Structures are given as structure tokens and as C-alpha cells.
Amino acid sequence: MATAYKVLAQQATTASLVSMYTVPASTETIISSIVVANTSASDRTYRITVQPNNATLAQKHYIAYDVTSKANTTTAYTLGITLDATDQVYILGSTTDLSISLFGSEIS
């Protein structure tokens, strides 16, 4: 099995929940870090979900819910989230002023 350490995804938020990352077929992923950067001079909020196997969104899938990101700040989460093929990470922000990055490894 090969392990690729990489930037998994980088995306600006929108006011709608959007898919940020989907684990490729025949692959497992470990998200080691999530970084949220607020590029606005105002506070913003965000949500992050992890949905296994194309599951319909439920309360249990949120790993962050309406978290406030202070103006012009960056928050880094060091994690060890394990994902299976087709699992997805979704994001939502109060505006487009938030940038979210996922870092980790894909094992295939």
C-alpha cells in the first residue's frame, strides 16, 4: 500500500454546505490537520461535517458547528480523522471570507 502525504483540499466557504473533499475509490484517508483562515476584518462562522458512505446529513456528522472565527485570524486543528473510500467532508461559512485547508495522507 502506498501512502501519499499531501494537501487534500483547499477551498473558500460559501453560505451553502458544499462538498470539499471526497475520498477516492480504493483509498483510505487520514486528515491530520484542518486550517481555517478568516481573511475578513469581521468575525465569521463556519461548519464542517464528515459524512461516511454518502450518508444523508445528520446532526452526528458535524465536527464543527457555527464556530466563530475572529477577524483576521487562523485556527489550526491537529486531528487524526480516518476516512474510508467515498466518505466526504463538507464545509459552510457565513461568507466567502473563510479559507479552509485539509492536510493529510491518502493510502491506496
Residue ranges and their predicted role:
Residues 1-29, 33, 54, 84, ...:
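C-terminal interaction-tip segments
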Residues 6, 22, 47, 63-66, ...:
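Compositionally biased, intrinsically disordered low-complexity regions enriched in proline and serine
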Residues 36-41, 94:
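Short solvent-exposed strand-capping/beta-turn motif centered on an Asx-Ser/Thr pair
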Residues 44, 61-65, 98:
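Short beta-strand segments
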Residues 44-55:
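The feature marks short-to-medium sequence segments in extracytoplasmic or secretory-pathway proteins
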Residues 53-88:
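Intrinsically disordered, low-complexity Pro/Gly/Ser/Thr-rich segments with frequent PxxP/GP/PP motifs
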